[in-house]
Regions:
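C-terminal catalytic core of Y-nucleophile DNA break-rejoin enzymes
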Residues: 2, 70-90, 104-124
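C-terminal secondary-structure termini that scaffold catalytic or DNA-interacting sites
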Residues: 2-6, 192-193
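Basic, Lys/Arg- and aromatic-enriched nucleic-acid-binding interface segment
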Residues: 9-38, 42, 100
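Short basic/aromatic active-site micro-motif
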Residues: 28, 135-153
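Active-site-proximal segment of tyrosine recombinases
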Residues: 44-46, 137, 147, 155-166
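Conserved tyrosine-mediated DNA breakage-rejoining catalytic core shared by Y-recombinases
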Residues: 47-76, 83-85
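A short, basic/aromatic helix-end/turn motif that makes direct DNA contacts
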Residues: 47-54, 161-167, 176-177
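Catalytic-site neighborhood detector that most strongly recognizes the C-terminal catalytic loop/helix
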Residues: 70, 166, 170-189
């Protein structure tokens, strides 16, 4: 199975530029942020409710608790919310004040007011990547980028496994890219003296 493309910074900016030209730019940036900054899958993004993300006072929660029906593995899971993601979610709440006061409403909504299915999320990612001229990118690109970048920054693979919500370490390891440059940097870390 071919893995989803990891975006360069320039490619990510290109996609954001395409999104910014869309009517629902804040909503779509939020969808991308959930993937790129929390590693959420399309089904998890589609399953989020307003109350999963915002407290009763409207503040962004620092941990999301996903119910079993919202996850791939059908188990309750938690997602740590980074400051970058909190910032985007706060902007979303500010932009869609009335919507984000309804705790049971789907977090992301269509132009018709209903929530998204996982397939709709997949299709939106695909449409924005296509408009940005990116081949090989999918709704899973943000998740793969999230996990790969954590590995590149030296985060322990067990920590990445927990953040990915994978049962098996071998699943997490498939997400983490390596190349000759990374291998060379790794061996240069050794000092014996």
């Amino acid at each position: 199975m071919k893995q989803a493309k990891i975006l360069t910074k320039a490619e990510y900016k290109r996609v954001m530029h395409v999104i910014d030209a869309h009517r629902y730019a804040v909503r779509n940036r939020t969808m991308f942020a959930l993937s790129f900054y929390a590693g959420l899958r399309a089904c998890e993004i589609a399953g989020l409710k307003v109350g999963d993300v915002y407290g009763e006072d409207g503040t962004v929660l620092n941990t999301l608790y996903l119910e079993s029906e919202q996850t791939k593995g059908s188990e309750q899971q938690q997602v740590i919310v980074s400051k970058q993601l909190q910032k985007q979610l706060a902007l979303y709440a500010k932009h869609y004040k009335a919507h984000t006061k309804q705790a049971n409403a789907p977090l992301l909504f269509s132009g018709k007011g209903g929530g998204f299915s996982a397939q709709t999320v997949i299709n939106l990612f695909s449409r924005f990547y296509s408009k940005a001229g990116l081949k090989g990118a999918s709704s899973h690109s943000g998740r793969r980028q999230f996990l790969t970048e954590l590995g590149d920054k030296g985060v322990n693979v067990r920590v990445i496994q927990v953040l990915a919500r994978h049962k098996h370490l071998s699943t997490t390891q498939r997400y983490i890219d390596y190349n000759e440059s990374k291998l060379r940097r790794a061996v240069e870390l050794m000092e014996i003296s």
